[in-house]
């Protein structure tokens, strides 16, 4: 098919950089990307370094190396003198001298030792004397370290105090760690020349972690990291393939805060818990309910509250097929709803009592039970997934209720709304006041609603920050010339196109999608059709999937002997066997590559490896694969390179979370509209994209603009899209397209295939049962690239094992790394003071030289006795030129058995080309690609 493009579309397609359009028309690179920009320039971190102490340490190491070499030589020259010694006493003295020289230690009595050697070998005695003098010079050199480090540490602490006043750090801390932010001023006022006490050292380490995060990491959060909408375009002054283009960053940043939607959920709980207020709210029956013989069938949706004390929290949503026995009272209720689809709760209770002659309290209890069971719902106060401003939308919903208490509550929300509105333009001091006022106002509202103690999440606001605008005509959009990264046939984008062929082998969800297809065929036969999608989902979970997930979660990919453990394949599906074969092929080839490259800093995956693994996936890999890749471009003379950090399958992932930042008039049209136009252009022929919202909005990570024309409305859900664009679950059926070897979701009303898309930022496993199952029919994927899985580590050197950098063409698939227990790292010497600090800094310098570490790394610590991602700390930046940075790392280590993984900071300072007036910034590009190998129209047979 020929894709249409929209001129302002984030997914407008351009030919793959570095190749002509005719090479592979099935694969395209989106011409728009989202750039993530670290808040502080790297140059700001230089103030924390100890360059003079580093130079001193390097001189010490060079002197030690020279003495070690000469000492070994002299030890050999002393060997015949030991054997020829005239008496036992002289022999023992010479033997001791020989050991001292070999070990680089100063002789016990240097003058006597030189005289002893001179008696039989004057030339060697002269060399020993020179060695002793140089060894004494080393002692003098070692003594220089303590005052140097003390002075530079004081300067570093003074620099740290200055940096702690940076707005982009402080504004982010107000939301990320308000407690720490509140302690920084006290730390700043202390004397940098004085060694901080235990309490202030803890503040210092935490402050350093956030400072390094603001300058070195690219995970968007408030002013720590901004996003900038960009596009690939030829700039007219870039040489092809040299990787030397400088990317100019926007100078103006703007904040876009939103209230944590958990706050609205807590207010709704209080309103619904009050019978008087509940009586005035409109109620509906759960959408999608049906008669099922003598029962009512519907989907029961429930929420489990998250931990309000956590920095990031959300309520867990769940849905289950549920049945209620039909009764006279229930039938009367259904009849009432048939005549009045949306009565108010109190009115419904009254009518139900009048119809059945029941006591009002009894009717109230009955409706309350149905409300808890989810058959009766009050949806008017729910947060809509497409709400750009959830707090205002909640206020508007209250006003629409039309009751005095609701109007008063809506008026009470005016002040919280004003606090949020004033927040973006405020400085740190005013923001601090606004957050405190917001908490007071919301706590007061909760008390007015009857809460004995307010229950508010720790984080009240989440803020996304935009760098520049999204309008290229305004001159503040980011532009990157793809020719600069084309390379000589194997640049990053060309390599990415090839690598995508093997990503299904790493996809965590592919075995689940294959299993679902196998279950369907076992239940409905090849070429079968299921008209009752809700029953299919229920049966799949009840009869198979829940047990399958439990079993799969316990699976370790490799056993204790390093052998691959196949995926659970209870249905004996050959496609799962093919996935296993592809993974084993990758592991076997990486083992062979590793065997030939021990000690190398970098190894390259041959094209034949990718071809072989891709060959195992023939007939298994999806034929329609929109992908999002997170890349960091690296400046290398004549060798353009990019680090591939993450890959996800799906549509619009780089943009969806940030649409509210780009939906203003100054942005040349809303980003949501542009993405939606792109979606329409990218749809497979005969198919439509339809969003799965995931039901209740329990997290700000689920909020985004409307990005598809259609939306799948699951039972129990409500939708804000136009009625004609809603696709209810009972309009859908599943059919086995044997020619294409895939399950196809179709709409009876539209007469077209429906491709489900999830556009939020929650992992699929966090979604309720129905949307999670529908995603097994979508192009959603998660493919963490574990290139070293099943490959044995090399022999350790003093407890340290290392891995080289892994490249495929112009892509870095894995950074260089070093793994060790905390006990193998340089330990703090006994005592405290400048001498101990200098000795420890020197020990780190010596350790880094021994294991060939670069100057800058990221450290990930897993506590002793624990494993898995939940136990690991987030990677912490470590600058080996900074004693303060090393001290912050030391604070993370609690046990000698803690496992520490150090990974090179790539790109490092010399590999960055993104600049602002402030300096050079770490950036990450989130790009989109689309591979479409689909044959046929997707239209119903």
What are these regions (language model features)?
Residues 174-178, 184-275, 755-816, 820-822, ...:
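Short, Φ-rich (hydrophobic/aromatic) sequence segments
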Residues 263-273, 277-286, 291-293, 515-526, ...:
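Segments forming glycine/polar-rich beta-alpha architectures that bind adenosine-containing cofactors
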Residues 2-259, 363-694, 870-941:
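Type-3 copper protein
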Residues 296-297, 383, 741-743:
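Hydrophobic residues embedded in beta-strands of well-ordered beta-sheets
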Residues 341-353:
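Short acidic, hydrophobic short linear motifs in intrinsically disordered regions
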Residues 355-362:
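Short, basic interhelical loop/turn and adjoining N-cap
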Residues 347, 632-904, 914-932:
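C-terminal structured domains
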Residues 2-22, 210-339:
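Acidic, low-complexity/disordered tracts enriched in E/D and polar residues
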